[in-house]
Amino acid sequence: MPDRGVPQDPALTHLAVAGYRSLQQLTLPLGGLTLVCGANGCGKSNLYRSLGLISAAARGDLVATLAAEGGLPAVFWAGPERTTAAMRRGEQPVQGSSGRREAARLRLGIAGETLSYAIELGYGADDHTSAFVLDPEIKREWLWAGGPFHPRSLLVQRNGAVVERCGEGGRNQPLALEVSPHESLFTAVSDPLDAPEVFQLRRT
């Protein structure tokens, strides 16, 4: 396997959040010291909590952390799927509708100069008779080289229960099969020899 130049101490440059509490979609540049200020209720606490969720994913207890917050129904963005121009001008209230056209998803990401990571969570079983239908599940994860995402930059990806190392020309190598929907790739693939990128980013 060719050496992809995994860094010793990747610096983080951006935090991205979508669908979490009051944060419909936000990308925040990060520096050596990032100061966030604003009026009460503008989302500062939710921004801090979202960063804590990414840390929980690295520790392997993200789903438990979400459950402690009240589960996905308590943390999902409750506003509209689309923000209209009238809403942005203050001419129309910003509120959710009774029906959703798209599956509810919580997306979190952290970007670095050399390594970046994103995770997508959603509800569990589609069987609405199941007692676990509202349980949070990890749907997808991505780990890529560099900051801005590009498919060619993917190093490791998770789709459902499968974690793969991404190879040239779409030739992917399975790293873990039958991964629990409550387990992130950081704990499913923990061997630094199999996936040094995962091991290194987890330490960041």
Language-model features: locations:
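Hydrophobic anchor at the beta1->P-loop junction of P-loop NTPases
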Residues: 36
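N-terminal pre-Walker A segment at the start of P-loop NTPase domains
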Residues: 2-24
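Conserved P-loop NTP-binding catalytic core
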Residues: 49-126
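Conserved lysine of the Walker
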Residues: 44
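Electropositive, glycine-dotted interaction segments
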Residues: 107-204
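ABC ATPase nucleotide-binding domain
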Residues: 27-29
